[in-house]
Regions:
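Short coil/turn segments at beta-strand junctions that form active-site/ligand-binding loops
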Residues: 74-76
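C-terminal domain-tail junction helix/linker
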Residues: 139-187
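Extended, low-complexity cationic-aromatic segments
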Residues: 1-65, 171, 175-181
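Acidic, metal-coordinating catalytic cores used for nucleic-acid/nucleotide bond scission
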Residues: 55-56, 79-90, 109-114, 139
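RNase H-like polynucleotidyl transferase catalytic core
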Residues: 20-28, 96-116, 132-134
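Short, solvent-exposed loop/turn segments at secondary-structure junctions
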Residues: 2-4, 42-44, 84-86, 110-112, ...
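Active-site proximal helix-loop segment of RNase H-like, two-metal nucleases, encompassing DDE(D)
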Residues: 47, 117-139, 150-152
């Protein structure tokens, strides 16, 4: 998840009280950003995540090395990810060639719902970021790290509620729509 903003409100919000919701000012001071690379272990729901100052191939390679350490052995690791350029850099491709147990699967454009870690990002946003006040990137990263630790104490796997057929149909519909907009883009 790139460009997570460390936002500080210009004034304190009013707390919730009987008959009124809590409030926040609409304006804010932006104190920088962080990038979170995260991997969701599907069976148990555990999340491995690391914050980085930037979202380049160098940081992504560091994260891949972390995953290689976290999941030792020769068991294949299937990574589902978006089409961000960082994931396709020549140095990343070279590293993947030397580490063939890493199998990358790229979701189609505008299909982030296919990537289960996006559900976890939603939880992170709802519970640790959205209404937060972060006076620095360090404060933001500390909040993300605390959420990761709390989540991993009692991880819950995300479970698909859609059927395989409905997912395949959504993908087909997505491809048809993309082909209408930009012929040849899905081949």
């Amino acid at each position: 998840k790139s460009q997570i903003q460390a936002l500080d409100r210009t004034q304190p919000g009013l707390p919730m009280k009987k008959g009124r919701c809590g409030t926040m000012t609409h304006d804010y001071k932006r104190n920088g950003t962080t990038t979170l690379f995260a991997a969701l272990e599907m069976l148990q729901g555990k999340v491995i995540g690391q914050c980085y100052q930037r979202h380049r191939h160098q940081e992504f390679l560091r994260f891949l090395r972390t995953l290689d350490t976290e999941f030792p052995g020769k068991v294949p690791l299937h990574l589902i990810m978006d089409n961000y350029g960082t994931h396709k850099h020549e140095n990343v491709r070279a590293w993947l060639t030397r580490h063939p147990r890493f199998v990358l699967h790229f979701v189609p454009t505008s299909s982030s719902w296919l990537n289960m870690v996006e559900r976890w990002f939603g939880q992170l946003d709802d519970k640790a970021i959205r209404r937060g006040v972060f006076r620095s990137v360090e404060d933001l990263e500390a909040s993300i790290d605390a959420f990761l630790i709390t989540w991993n104490k009692d991880p819950k796997p995300f479970v698909w509620t859609a059927t395989v057929d409905s997912i395949v149909e959504k993908l087909a519909r997505c491809r048809r729509t993309l082909e209408k907009i930009q012929p040849g883009c899905t081949s």
